[in-house]
Amino acid sequence: VTNARAGQINYMDGMKMDKSCRMLQATCAIPMLFPAIEIDGQYYYDGGVCEPITIHKAEADGYHKHIIILTREKTYIKEKDKSNELAAKILKRRFPNMVKPLLERHDYYNAEVAYCNELEAKGQALLFRPEYPLASMEKDIDKLQDGYDMGYQQAMRRMGEIRAFCGLTD
């Protein structure tokens, strides 16, 4: 999750979730669409604001091989977003440290994807991406099911590659 006061990523232990699941709520709290979620006197938003792909955390935790599921097709480049500019303007007074992450969110995302591509080229990662664009706020159940089916079929087609990558043999 993103600590709204610090404007930095904060990793929490999911095993210590309270009964109201505020930690889970924070992981979905997109600035401007949802209020910051208070946990132990601190306010949090979705972690993707500061760290869109948690590959560096996985490496810091000692992992050397990664299966990464991206939510955008291969050709996608995140552009500067007017909604992030508006969110930065509105949140500036209450959470001034959120301004920079919001205004540079597209750069963070594109850099993380580039790094994942490098890991894949070095044989340290397998990347899975949708074969066609999916709306990030999709509500249509049929379209969501189609997206799920696409991912499942992609995994089945690449199962031999996945097993080899993980060192599993038949």
Regions found by a protein language model. Give the residues of each.
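Patatin-like phospholipase
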Residues: V1-D170
